Amino acid sequence: MSIKAFFVDFYGTIVHEDGEVIKKITKIICDTGKVEDPSEVDSFWWRDFQTMFMNSYGETFETQRSLEEKSLVHTLERFGSNADAKELSSMMFAHWIKPPIFEDSKPFFENSPLPVYVVSNIDTSDILQAIAYHDLHPAGVFTSEDAKSYKPGKELFELALRSAGLMPEEVIHIGDSVSSDVQGAAKAGIRALWLNRFGKSVPEGVESISELPEAFAFLSP
């Protein structure tokens, strides 16, 4: 069966992740709290967020904004910082709606011979603003908020398939996360390409590309 569409992740794939903003927030926490090693802040914050993230599903689902703000509050409390959680969160949210874009992203959308659907772990309002900000025109946008489930769960992929009227074998998914994108897509029976922009070691059995337009070569019979 021929490929009829691309699914693509957004943050880290089409646009830059919020790593630089997180560095700034971590520094503020270090400057206002009791921190011996800045890496401790990053580790605690990430683990706390991931714990809530993995338990956010169905009736217990919470938006990405809610999870980020809660994990930030927990991190401020853990390190005795008097910084304002809402103020720090707003720095992240500002990035989410106006993130810098990778140079190959617009050419990918403009030159793709197939429809491109965005499939992302993010709140719907934020990604729609980011897509409009960069004047991108995907065939559809599906978010964790829509599915009430985050990747690497298969629910978001299955929602995208149903909504687009596609079978798993008719889609190639592209994303920058081996766990969320490659393994998550596999759970839904979708072939995935790992977007390895930074030359990392490629895990065995994983198909990878270094730039988005390289995906077009995988459409050849």
Feature annotation, model-predicted:
Residues 3-103:
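N-terminal helical cap/lid subdomain that shapes the substrate entry/recognition surface
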Residues 1-8, 83, 106, 110, ...:
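Asp-based, Mg2+/Mn2+-dependent phosphohydrolase catalytic module
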